[in-house]
């Protein structure tokens, strides 16, 4: 999936949870949503993008600050577990 599409999807999640009065709860909500509903390959692509662009800036698209913080703080949990054959 193209990174711009993933950023736009993640930003919509961030905009939803931004309305929460408790920032920590909002960060947890973003991370939980991405963990539960994004396929492992989508999470891998987003994490790989952040390896290349830690500020979340893709040039034409930029990660919402809440999403950037949520993914960065929960990177280990969001990293898909490799299956052993």
Regions found by a protein language model. Give the residues of each.
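Intrinsically disordered, low-complexity, basic-enriched segments
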Residues: 1-85
């Amino acid at each position: 999936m193209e990174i711009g599409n993933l950023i736009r999807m993640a930003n919509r999640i961030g905009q939803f949870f931004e309305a929460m009065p408790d920032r920590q709860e909002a960060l947890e909500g973003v991370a939980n949503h991405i963990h539960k509903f994004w396929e492992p390959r989508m999470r891998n692509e987003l994490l790989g993008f952040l390896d290349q662009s830690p500020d979340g800036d893709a040039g034409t698209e930029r990660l919402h600050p809440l999403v950037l913080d949520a993914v960065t703080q929960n990177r280990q949990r969001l990293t898909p577990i490799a299956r052993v054959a």
